[in-house]
């Protein structure tokens, strides 16, 4: 069982530079076809300063850390014990190439199902750009067996 006293635990902020290459690779990998993710001219024509990141692009930010699964170790969860159950983003401003994103996360909730056989961890993250503008918030739910 995961210690409920860990609810509210925060993690050190992490910074990620959004580049044209990262956007193009992610857009290609996720089957995007809109040219605003590939061609600067198309993005600018639509009013963006540079390539626009696809909506789920921010998922990749946490995986750029030196140890992206450190939070699992902190909670004594082995990699094979959990599944990603849900992810929800709320966007406030576009994320574009040239942005520097700061990600701040915390464990916001922990609850059980099936008599405690399954534990659900809810992480909330805030993504802020170089201008200190909150561009998005996310809620990620993991299930641990």
What are these regions (language model features)?
Residues 1-84:
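Hot-dog-fold acyl-thioester-processing enzymes
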Residues 1-2, 6, 91-145:
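HotDog/MaoC-like acyl-thioester-processing domains
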Residues 84-90:
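A beta-strand/beta-hairpin structural motif
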